[in-house]
A protein has these predicted regions:
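Conserved AAA+ ATPase "SRH/arginine-finger" region at the nucleotide-binding site
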Residues: 59-62, 164-171
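Pre-Walker A (pre-P-loop) alpha-helix and adjacent loop at the N terminus of AAA/AAA+ ATPase modules
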Residues: 3-39
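Conserved Walker
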Residues: 11, 30, 34-38, 80-91, ...
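Short glycine-/polar-rich loops that comprise or flank the Walker A/P-loop
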Residues: 30-31, 54-56, 96-97, 122-124, ...
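AAA+/P-loop NTPase substrate/partner-engagement loops
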Residues: 53-79
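Walker A/P-loop
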Residues: 25-63
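Conserved AAA+/SF3 P-loop NTPase catalytic/coupling segment centered on the Walker-B
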Residues: 46, 66-69, 93-120, 152-160
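Conserved alpha-helical scaffold flanking the Walker A/P-loop in AAA+ ATPase domains
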Residues: 22-25, 79-100
Length: 171
């Protein structure tokens, strides 16, 4: 990640959220982590700080992502330059072996949620579009954050998280 990281250990409180994220860092196969809480409870800060820990590679899935960004597609520059269609990997393929962070996961569009669920289930990203058919490994740990005031999470996506932590404001 290219943004400055707030150190994981510098976040005061939120011990259950920290413990869940550290469990994921140690054993990515636990099934992912969902942090749910109101705005300003350090959910995103903690997840981004996880990427600063040794051995953890973190990629972010923006809520504004498109299918091309998520799955990949034709590398337009190469297609224009050479006339050949070459595959440009999307975020899911690049997340292989990493932690994929979806902020406001409950706000992801249905098409992205379906692609994410399929890839989580199979561990493979399949792309068939624009005259390209491509398959690549995509085994990653999913971390999501959400504010319940902004909507619920689809049940089929909720089932993909092994750990759920309700994050509250420290008093």
């Amino acid at each position: 990640m290219d943004r400055p990281l707030y150190p994981f250990t510098a976040v005061v409180g939120q011990e259950r959220a920290k413990q869940a994220l550290l469990c994921l860092a140690v054993e990515p196969r636990i099934g992912g982590v969902l942090l749910c809480g109101e705005k300003g409870t350090a959910k995103s800060t903690l997840v981004r700080a996880l990427g600063g820990l040794e051995g953890v590679r973190l990629l972010e899935l923006p809520v504004s992502a498109t299918e091309d960004m998520l799955l990949g597609g034709v590398e337009l520059e190469a297609a224009v330059r050479t006339g050949c269609r070459t595959f440009q990997p999307g975020l899911l393929a690049r997340a292989d072996g990493a932690v994929l962070y979806a902020d406001e996961v409950n706000l992801l569009p249905s098409a992205l949620t379906a692609a994410l669920l399929d890839t989580l289930e199979t561990g493979v990203c399949r792309v068939e579009r624009d005259g390209i058919s491509h398959t690549c490994p995509a085994r990653f740990a999913l971390v999501g954050t959400m504010n319940p005031e902004e909507g619920t999470l689809r049940p089929q996506l909720l089932d993909r998280f092994g750990l759920y932590v309700a994050v509250t404001g420290e008093r």
